[in-house]
Amino acid sequence: MADLLLECLIQKMFCLISFKEASKMSILSKSWLQAWSTLPNLEFFVNCWQGWVAHINIVDTIMERYGKGKIPIEKFELSVFFADSTQLFPLIDKWLLVALQNGVKELILHFTSYPAPILTILAEKSLRELVLHDCTLMPVSLSSGVVSCNSLRKISLSYVTLDENMLQTLFYSCPFIVSFLLEYCSGLTMKHIKIKSDSLKVLKIHQYCGIWEIEAPDLVSLDYTGNEIPVLNIARESSQ
């Protein structure tokens, strides 16, 4: 019990410092190494500089260990800046699956043109926050067997490619979403785009397309940048 408590305390301390600093401190003792080896927060940044193959192999080794050991993952952040990113897609799919299977709560992906498997992501029942940057969301219609992600509370999409059906799918699949950010995304071509959510409290839209209609009776914060003033409906209908 004492060893487990010590490991938990060390892990909490590791979460307060950078990944690089935590790796250096892992050599202090077996307890520190064990805590380092089971960190719940994983953050990986891969650049297309010399030695990138070794970096990819390190990430792959770590994710295989987490997968085989079923080590819980609370946060998984992956940022890849690579010229020919498509060759890494199979690896990204594999790492993402490990994170989802291990109960990830916060998922952050920054990867140019990566076709994020959104239905697989939304099927994860423990996910609370989803942040996508530069990714592509596969076209999905409401008739495609969309799952409900009742745990998801926050979605942030920046420079993501998606269409109107995907936007509606996200709100339809996440009935308890509280915060939503849509920033300079492409693919939204309809002249009239509507956002409807009974749970949404914080909404940020930085887009220069479409005439927005926002129906969110619980909305308390709106940050909007666009060509048209949105139509707001924030009055809750009377039950009488």
What are these regions (language model features)?
Residues 1-189, 194:
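Leucine-rich repeat
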Residues 197, 203-240:
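Acidic, glycine-rich loop-and-beta core segments that form the ion-binding/anion-interacting portion
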